[in-house]
Structure formats: structure tokens, C-alpha cells
A protein has these predicted regions:
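Acidic, surface-exposed loops and disordered segments
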Residues: 1-184
């Protein structure tokens, strides 16, 4: 089902959130037991589709998971995803090799889409955490089998989303020693 953004009641913000959301985004691993609103999910996905991609190939497929049993199953696929069972939603981010057969380029495109989702979630007051899958063969094969993915669709990572139930402490990560002008 496609989201209809043309006729929705969603108010388009004019960037007042972007820098605050970027500077204050944290990885959230503790969530309130509340479902996300459909409009919020649609905005998070719209942010993903607004990302740049090589040759505008948009080599992404997203599996949106809200079912608690499925989230629990996903949380058991790796020790690093244990908190996914308590999230309101998970998204499995997959590369579509029919759009670009280079997983190296797909990773760049999917990373841009993922960061857009993380920032949009933060702007909506929703926490998130990026959970690596690929290139860990055991993890991506488990997801591939679990979702019975068609040939050419490669699960790259998962993202947990939910209303925040932990103290967030954003850190200023800027490090001028890692910035070089004109030469290294």
C-alpha cells in the first residue's frame, strides 16, 4: 500500500527540525510500549525515499515490522538486537540488486536512506537504533530465510523505532583534528 502524501493532513516542516535532530540524535535501546502512528511511519518512510542514490537507482526495499511476535523473532537473531522485541516497529533495510548489482554502491545508497529515517524519527520524538546485519553471513542468511526473500534482495541491516523510554544524552562529536583543508 502506498502512502498518499499529496492529500494527507501531514504538515510539511520547513527545516526547523533538521539540525536539532541531527545534532541530538542518539541510539535508543529502550522504548515505551506504545504503537507508532501511521502518519509517523509514513513520514519516516518518505524520508528514506528522499535520499540520494547512485543514478537515482533507489536500490532499496523496506520490510516494516510491527507484529510483536516477529519483532521478538528478529531480536533473537543476534545478541546485539535483543531490545528490538520491545520496539514499536522495526524496519529491515534490503538492497535490491536488480537496481544496482554492486552491494558496495547499494550500501552507500541504503546508508543515506537509513540516516534520513533516523533523523526524521528523531524530529518526530521517536527513538531509533541501527542494527548491523550484512556482511555477517549468519545474520543476513537468517533474515533472508525468515522473510523468504526473493533472489537479488539482500537484507543489509535492521532499524528499531519507538517512543523513547530512557534518558538521552547527546554528545558533541565534532572533532576538528579529523578535518583537513586542501591537504591531509
Amino acid at each position: 500500500m502506498k502512502a498518499n502524501f499529496q492529500n494527507s493532513d501531514i504538515i510539511v516542516r520547513k527545516g526547523e527540525w533538521s539540525m536539532d535532530a541531527i545534532f541530538n540524535r542518539t541510539s535508543v535501546r529502550k522504548y515505551k510500549q506504545e504503537s507508532l502512528k501511521k502518519e509517523e511511519i509514513d513520514l519516516i518512510l518518505k524520508a528514506a525515499f528522499s535520499a540520494p542514490s547512485a543514478r537515482n537507482s533507489q536500490p532499496w526495499q523496506f520490510i516494516v515490522v510491527e507484529n510483536k511476535d516477529t519483532l521478538k523473532d528478529l531480536s533473537q537473531m543476534t545478541t546485539y538486537a535483543s531490545f528490538l522485541k520491545d520496539a514499536a516497529m522495526g524496519i529491515v533495510v534490503c538492497a535490491d540488486k536488480s537496481k544496482n548489482d554492486s552491494l558496495d554502491y547499494c550500501q552507500q545508497d541504503l546508508a543515506a536512506a537509513t540516516e534520513n529515517m533516523l533523523v526524521e524519527a528523531k524530529s518526530l520524538g521517536i527513538g531509533s537504533c541501527w542494527l548491523g546485519v550484512y556482511p555477517n553471513e549468519e545474520r543476513y542468511l537468517a533474515l533472508n530465510q525468515y522473510f523468504k526473500l526473493p533472489k537479488g534482495i539482500v537484507p543489509m541491516w535492521m532499524i528499531s523505532f519507538g517512543y523513547i523510554d530512557q534518558e538521552e544524552v547527546a554528545k558533541d562529536k565534532f572533532d576538528s583534528s579529523k578535518v583537513h583543508y586542501e591537504k591531509y
